[in-house]
């Protein structure tokens, strides 16, 4: 895995393509600010060809390109890219399909058109001094030999990077890594991973692509995006930091704050068990786990919650043990009598089953006081 990896967040483009999600100009600005504050240095901001408020937002941030690389996304239409360059943007992306099926269904063109269009658009944008990124979309259903040919054409034209998009998440990690390696062996160009989560493998595929030599990778906050979403910013960044010793300069303590901002904007809740940013990631209920945590907090946590802006919680419930009941009472200023703990534990478990959830400290105190009376 390289040491010069570059994260690019696409919450404002692919993330907003989540069915039912629409960000206002003000919301997109707030998300952009939060990403930059967290240390994200490359951000795909939207699609100028949509016009309206989308274009208003894009125009409003053209003077902020010194804060992060701001990438604008385009169809395979030369005039679209030219308009973005005329606005003053210096980083452009062109989305083009490479599979025969997508070429026929999406743009009604063939591969002769594709190669000519890709070459022309890259050369035009490079002649104007832009950083040029271009897609190979639907790589799972594109022959590896054609991916290599396409990579050679866009590299020769001067493209700065090739985005390998597993558009409907059909690849496993081994197959995704194989395609990255095949492209890198055939062309002198940086590769960007763009993995969708239809089989729950977007994070694994992104890491596999990076291990195969890709430099860039796409993520979204909370993994939002088309259908099942894509690779999650927090998951990939923390995995790189904790498992692969790659520090991308992201302020991990801001991950949960950014996650909640985007969740509210998208009208979605963050699942309690969402890795890294979910509320249950550092929550403990079962007796064995809580007992171990009281002795050594590394027993049942991969890293301290404060590393990612989280908090440790202990939850009273059906699976709790006496140690957790005693601890909870002590938190309420009560030194529990040892002989009352078995009864209190039995009552906590029974109440948890009746209400179908966690027992509050107030309910525990009531149970204890009745037993002690």
From Swiss-Prot:
Catalytic activity line of the entry: 3-phosphonopyruvate + acetyl-CoA + H2O = (R)-2-(phosphonomethyl)malate + CoA + H(+)
UniProt keyword list: Antibiotic biosynthesis, Transferase
TM ranges: none
Enzyme Commission designation: 2.3.3.19
Any one GO molecular function term: acyltransferase activity, acyl groups converted into alkyl on transfer
CDD domains: DRE_TIM_NifV
Positions of the Pyruvate carboxyltransferase domain: 5-256
Transferase in keyword set: yes
Species lineage: Bacteria, Bacillati, Actinomycetota, Actinomycetes, Kitasatosporales
Protein name listed in UniProt: 2-phosphonomethylmalate synthase
GO process terms (BP): antibiotic biosynthetic process; carboxylic acid metabolic process
SUPFAM superfamilies given in the database record: Aldolase
Pfam family, one: HMGL-like
Role of this protein: Acyltransferase involved in the biosynthesis of the phosphonate antibiotic FR-900098, a potent antimalarial agent that acts as an inhibitor of 1-deoxy-D-xylulose 5-phosphate reductoisomerase (DXR), the first enzyme in the nonmevalonate pathway for isoprenoid biosynthesis. Catalyzes the condensation between acetyl-CoA and phosphonopyruvate to yield (R)-2-(phosphonomethyl)malate.
Domain of life, per lineage: Bacteria
Family per similarity comment: Belongs to the alpha-IPM synthase/homocitrate synthase family.
Biochemical pathway: Antibiotic biosynthesis
PANTHER family: HOMOCITRATE SYNTHASE (PTHR42880), ISOPROPYLMALATE_HOMOCITRATE_CITRAMALATE SYNTHASE FAMILY PROTEIN (PTHR42880:SF1)
């Amino acid at each position: 895995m390289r040491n010069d990896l570059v994260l690019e967040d696409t919450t404002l483009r692919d993330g907003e393509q989540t069915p039912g999600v629409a960000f206002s100009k003000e919301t997109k600005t707030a998300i952009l600010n939060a990403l930059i504050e967290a240390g994200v240095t490359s951000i795909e901001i939207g699609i100028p060809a949509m016009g309206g408020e989308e274009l208003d937002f894009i125009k409003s941030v053209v003077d902020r390109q010194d804060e992060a690389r701001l990438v604008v996304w385009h169809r395979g239409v030369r005039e679209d890219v030219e308009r973005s360059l005329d606005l003053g943007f210096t980083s452009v992306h062109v989305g083009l399909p490479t599979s025969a099926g997508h070429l026929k269904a999406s743009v009604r063109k063939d591969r002769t058109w594709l190669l000519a269009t890709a070459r022309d658009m890259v050369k035009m944008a490079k002649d104007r001094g832009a950083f040029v990124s271009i897609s190979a979309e639907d790589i799972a259903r594109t022959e590896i030999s054609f991916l290599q040919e396409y990579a050679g054409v866009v590299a020769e034209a001067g493209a700065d990077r090739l985005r390998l998009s597993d558009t409907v998440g059909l690849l496993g990690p081994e197959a995704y890594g194989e395609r990255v390696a095949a492209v890198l062996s055939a062309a002198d160009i940086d590769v960007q991973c763009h993995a969708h989560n239809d089989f729950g493998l977007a994070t694994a595929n992104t890491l596999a692509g990076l291990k195969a030599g890709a430099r860039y990778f796409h993520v979204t906050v909370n993994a939002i995006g088309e259908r099942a979403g894509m690779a999650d910013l927090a998951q990939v960044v923390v995995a790189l930091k904790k498992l692969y010793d790659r520090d991308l300069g992201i302020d991990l303590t801001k991950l949960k704050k950014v996650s909640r901002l985007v969740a509210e904007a998208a009208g979605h809740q963050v699942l309690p068990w969402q890795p890294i940013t979910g509320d249950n990631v550092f929550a403990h209920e079962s007796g064995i786990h809580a007992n171990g945590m009281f002795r050594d907090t590394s027993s049942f946590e991969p890293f301290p919650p404060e590393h990612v802006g989280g908090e440790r919680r202990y939850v009273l419930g059906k699976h709790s043990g006496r140690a957790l009941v005693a601890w909870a009472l002590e938190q309420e200023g009560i030194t529990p009598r040892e002989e009352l703990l078995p009864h209190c534990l039995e009552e906590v478990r029974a109440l948890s089953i009746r209400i179908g959830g966690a027992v509050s400290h107030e309910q525990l105190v009531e149970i204890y006081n009745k037993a002690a009376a």
